[in-house]
C-alpha cells in the first residue's frame, strides 16, 4: 500500500478509506492537481488526515510527536474497532470490518473475539444453555429462548396477508414464499383469480 492514498477522518473514528486499484489513479491525480493549485510539491502522500482546517499531510511538521504517539495508542486499543472504507472508481464506497479473529480448528475468520468464542462451541460440542422443561441444550441463549416457544405455544410472528401465526421468523418467511393462497388474497380476505 505504499502508493495507495489513505484517508483517515477525525469524524469517522477508526475508519480508513482504502481506494480500489481502479480508483487509485483517479484519486492520486485529484490529490496531485489539488497540490499544484496550492503550490505544494507534486507527489502523492501515503496518508492524509482530515482536520477542521482542511487536509493535513503526514509530511506536515505542525503535528507533534506526542500527537503521533497518542494516535498510535488509540489505533492499538482493544476497544477500537478498525473499519476500512473501500472507495470504488465511481465514487461509491463500502464500510468493511476486518475479520481478525481466526478459528484454529477450521480457519474461519470472525470480526470479534465474542463471535470466535461462540463459534468454537461448535467444535467442542459444548452447549451451555439448557431447557428446563425438556433438557435440550443449545449453543446460544437466543436459540434456547426461541425453543421455549414450542413449550409455551407463543407465536409472535404473524403474516399480514392471511393472519396465520408462527413461532419463528424463518417459518414466517418460508410461509410467505411458499403459500400461493397467501400471495393471491386481496385486502378484504377474498381470493383473486
UniProtKB/Swiss-Prot annotation:
Keyword Zinc: yes
Residues carrying Phosphoserine: 44
UniProt biased composition (Basic and acidic residues): 55-69
ZnF endpoints (C2H2-type): 101-123, 129-151, 157-179
Record's GO cellular component terms: chromatin; nucleus
Region of interest: Disordered: 33-75
Subcellular localization, as worded in the UniProt entry: Nucleus
Gene Ontology terms describing biological process: regulation of transcription by RNA polymerase II
Primary residence: nucleus
Keywords tagged on the record: Isopeptide bond, Metal-binding, Nucleus, Phosphoprotein, Repeat, Transcription, Transcription regulation, Ubl conjugation, Zinc, Zinc-finger
Cross-linked sites for Glycyl lysine isopeptide (Lys-Gly) (interchain with G-Cter in SUMO2): 34
Pfam family, one: zf-C2H2
GO molecular function: DNA-binding transcription factor activity; DNA-binding transcription factor activity, RNA polymerase II-specific; RNA polymerase II cis-regulatory region sequence-specific DNA binding; sequence-specific double-stranded DNA binding; zinc ion binding
Disulphide-bridged cysteine pairs: none
Record-stated family: Belongs to the krueppel C2H2-type zinc-finger protein family.
Function in brief: May be involved in transcriptional regulation.
Protein name from the UniProt record: Zinc finger protein 740
Species annotation: Homo sapiens
Amino acid at each position: 500500500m505504499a502508493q495507495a492514498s489513505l484517508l483517515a477522518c477525525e469524524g469517522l473514528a477508526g475508519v480508513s478509506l482504502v481506494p480500489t486499484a481502479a480508483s487509485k489513479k483517479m484519486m492520486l491525480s485529484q490529490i496531485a492537481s489539488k497540490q499544484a493549485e496550492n503550490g505544494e510539491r507534486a507527489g502523492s502522500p501515503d496518508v492524509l488526515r482530515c482536520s477542521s482546517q482542511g487536509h493535513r499531510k503526514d509530511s506536515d511538521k505542525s503535528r507533534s510527536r506526542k500527537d503521533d504517539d497518542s494516535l498510535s495508542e488509540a489505533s492499538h486499543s482493544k476497544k477500537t474497532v478498525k473499519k476500512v472504507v473501500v472507495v470504488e472508481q465511481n465514487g461509491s464506497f463500502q464500510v468493511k470490518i476486518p475479520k481478525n479473529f481466526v478459528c484454529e480448528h477450521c480457519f474461519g475468520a470472525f470480526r470479534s473475539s465474542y463471535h470466535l468464542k461462540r463459534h468454537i462451541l461448535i467444535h467442542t460440542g459444548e452447549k451451555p444453555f439448557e431447557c428446563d422443561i425438556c433438557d435440550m441444550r443449545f449453543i446460544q441463549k437466543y436459540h434456547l429462548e426461541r425453543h421455549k416457544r414450542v413449550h409455551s405455544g407463543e407465536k409472535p410472528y404473524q403474516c399480514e396477508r392471511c393472519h396465520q401465526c408462527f413461532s419463528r421468523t424463518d417459518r414466517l418467511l418460508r410461509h410467505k414464499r411458499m403459500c400461493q393462497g397467501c400471495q393471491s388474497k386481496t385486502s378484504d380476505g377474498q381470493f383473486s383469480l
